[in-house]
Structure formats: structure tokens, C-alpha cells
Amino acid sequence: MRQHVNPLSQFFQLPLSLPSKNILFEKSHYPIHLDIGSAKGEFLIELATKCPDWNFVGLEIREPLVSLCEKKRRKLELTNLKFLFCNVNVSLDEWLSDLDFGQLKRVSIQFPDPWFKRKHFKRRVLKTNILNSIAKAMSKNGEIFIQSDIFELIEYMTNTIDENRYFTRKNVGDLRSINKNPYNVMTDREILSLKKNLLIYRVMYIRNSLLFTN
């Protein structure tokens, strides 16, 4: 399975109509945690098991991984979790617009593809349009949590979110001040990075009270 796919290729630019929350979940009124780049899904599977009064959505651009995650989910009979294939920069906004305002409580972006070459920065997942879509759907005190073991990437991500007026950084200053995953569940990459004694940079943003305007 390829580690990286080019989200700007023609295939991934085709918008997908994602299933609505009422189709995805039996209890569609529950608060939602959205994990962008859910990879093998172990983080959300454990979290969904521990938090039955939340709904969890994992979005992943590598379709074989989505199939693998859905197979695991069905085996565990988790009805508060779904994994979906899509390019979030193309298909997320429409799906979020279907949610009740404020239902989206948490968004996590953990160890995304770094795309090191400057000419490939535009392939990185976090962009202004995604942040605005999230800001439009999220009410005050909603969360965006990001983490990476690559300083240049976390710096890029924090700079991008800092420029957005709808989110306020909770831990200003030291990017290492959050010493563990705030949801008390670790991703596979997080576990591997800790075993290698790599520094992990974690940042939490809070949706402020500014009303969203286009």
C-alpha cells in the first residue's frame, strides 16, 4: 500500500457525496469527533469503545485503509464509529453543512503526511478552506487538536491556524507543553515515535466566540 497519495491528482479532485449523519449513525444527535487522516483506525476504534455517548468519524484518502478500518469496526459492532474515504479539501464542507450547528465538538489531525519539498506544500492536508468549514460548523469551545513528530510540519500547521481568526491557541509558546494525547488514547504513529524517543509536538486550539462570516 502506498504511504502517500497525491491529493491534487485528478482522481482525488472529484467531489464525493458522503453519507449524512442520519445514515451513518443510529444516534445521530450525539456530539461528533472528526479525525482527519485516520490511517489504520486504531485510535478511533479505542476511543469509540471508551466513549459510547459520542459519534466518531475517520476520514482517510487511502481507500484500502478505509476498507480495512471498516472491517475492524464491523467485527467489533461499533455503531458510533464510521470510516469514510474522501479528500477532505474537496468533500468535507458539504458533509459538515448537514450537521446541527455545534454538533461538531472535536477535530483531530495527527501525524499527517509531511510533504517535505516546498513545491509539495500545497499537498498538505491543512488549508484555510478546511479551517473555515470547521469554524462554520463548530460552536464556541470546540477543539482542534494537532500533533506531529516533525517540527517543520507542526510549525506550518500552527502558522496556518494562527492566521485564522476563529481559533485561539490554548498552549501558547512551547510546542511540547502538552505531554500526552488529551484524549488518553494514542495513535499507532504516536506509540512508535515514543518508542524511538522522538519529540512529539502537540497543540490544542479552541473555537472562539466570533460568529462565522464568509
From Swiss-Prot:
| Amino acids binding S-adenosyl-L-methionine | 35, 60, 87, 113
> Where substrate is bound, by residue?
117, 149
EC no. given is 2.1.1.33
Q: What is the lineage of its organism?
A: Bacteria, Bacillati, Cyanobacteriota, Cyanophyceae, Synechococcales
| Catalytic class of the enzyme | transferase
| CDD domains xrefs | AdoMet_MTases (cd02440)
Q: Which family does it belong to?
A: Belongs to the class I-like SAM-binding methyltransferase superfamily. TrmB family.
Q: Which residues form the active site?
A: 113
Matching Gene3D superfamilies, A to Z?
Vaccinia Virus protein VP39
The record, for InterPro entries, names:
SAM-dependent_MTases_sf, tRNA_(Gua-N-7)_MeTrfase_Trmb, tRNA_methyltr_TrmB_bact
- Stated role: Catalyzes the formation of N(7)-methylguanine at position 46 (m7G46) in tRNA.
Originating species: Prochlorococcus marinus (strain NATL2A)
Task: Provide the reaction this enzyme catalyses.
Answer: guanosine(46) in tRNA + S-adenosyl-L-methionine = N(7)-methylguanosine(46) in tRNA + S-adenosyl-L-homocysteine
Does this entry carry the keyword Methyltransferase? yes
Keyword annotations:
Methyltransferase, S-adenosyl-L-methionine, Transferase, tRNA processing
This entry's Gene Ontology molecular function terms read: tRNA (guanine(46)-N7)-methyltransferase activity
Q: What is this protein called?
A: tRNA (guanine-N(7)-)-methyltransferase
Pathway it works in: tRNA modification; N(7)-methylguanine-tRNA biosynthesis
Give one Pfam family. Methyltransf_4
Keyword S-adenosyl-L-methionine assigned to the entry: answer is yes
Q: Which PROSITE patterns match?
A: SAM_MT_TRMB (PS51625)
One Gene Ontology cellular component:
tRNA methyltransferase complex
